[in-house]
Amino acid sequence: MNASPIIEIKHLTKRFKNATEDAVKDISCTVSRNEIFGLLGPNGAGKTTTLSILCGLFPPTSGSVLIDGRNIQKDLPYIRKIVGIVPQDIALYSSLTAKENLDFYGHMYGLKGKDLKYKIAYWLEKLDLTEASDRLVSDFSGGMKRRINLIAGILHQPKILFLDEPTVGVDVQSRNVIITHLKELNKAGTTIIYTSHLMEEAENFCTYVSIIDHGRILTGDSPTALISSHKGAANLEDVFLRLTNRKPRDQ
C-alpha cells in the first residue's frame, strides 16, 4: 500500500452558531492513499460533522484540511471533482425512477452520452438492481435505496469516497452487497473514508480506524492492532466500550 497521505487534517475544530461547545475538537490525523479509513463512534460523537467538513459542505471554525495536496477551502471545485459522497440521508428523488436518479447525478458530475449509460447499466447490474431500474424510488425497500444512493456517489469513479453510515437500517443481504462492492472499489484504487457505529462491520471492513467521542479522537490504528493493544479485548467493540466508558448496546 502506498502510505503517502491523500488527506491531512490538522487541528480541526468546529463550533456551530449559538452552540456552547465544539462539535469537533482539535482533530488531527492523516488518511493514506488506498486506505479504508473508519471514523467510528456513537450517535452525536462528531462523525458526520467531521465528514461534512471534509466534503466541503461547511467550513471549519479553525484548523486545516488538505485533500490530494489541495486546501479544501481554497480548491473546493477541484476537490469536488475527485470525491464521491454517499450521505446517511437518502439523497434520491422519490418521484423519479432509479435510472432517472442516476442520470441526474451522472450529469451533475459531467458524465454524458454512451459513457453515462454504460456506467449506470454496469452498476445497476453489479448491485443487483437492473430489473428495478425503471421503477420509482418511492417503491424501493430501504436496502434498495441504499444501493442506489451508493451508485449515485461512485458513477464518476472518484479518487476518494466519503460514506456516512452507508449500511444503517438495511437488511443483512443488502449490507453484504454494499460492503462487497466497496471492497472491490478500494482494490481498484479508491480511498474510502467511512463513518459508522457498527463495530463488527468496521472491524472486518476497515484497514484503519479512529474512534471518536464527544468531538475528540480517542485513538487510531488498524483494528487488529487496537484489539491487541487492549488486554482482554476480544474485538473492536470491546475496545470502543472501554474507551468511551459505555456498556454493550449503549451506542
Predicted features by range, described:
Residues 63-74, 78-79:
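Conserved ABC transporter NBD signature motif
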Residues 161-165:
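Catalytic Walker B motif of ABC-type/P-loop ATPase nucleotide-binding domains
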Residues 220-221:
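ABC ATPase "signature
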Residues 95, 136-140:
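Conserved ABC ATPase signature
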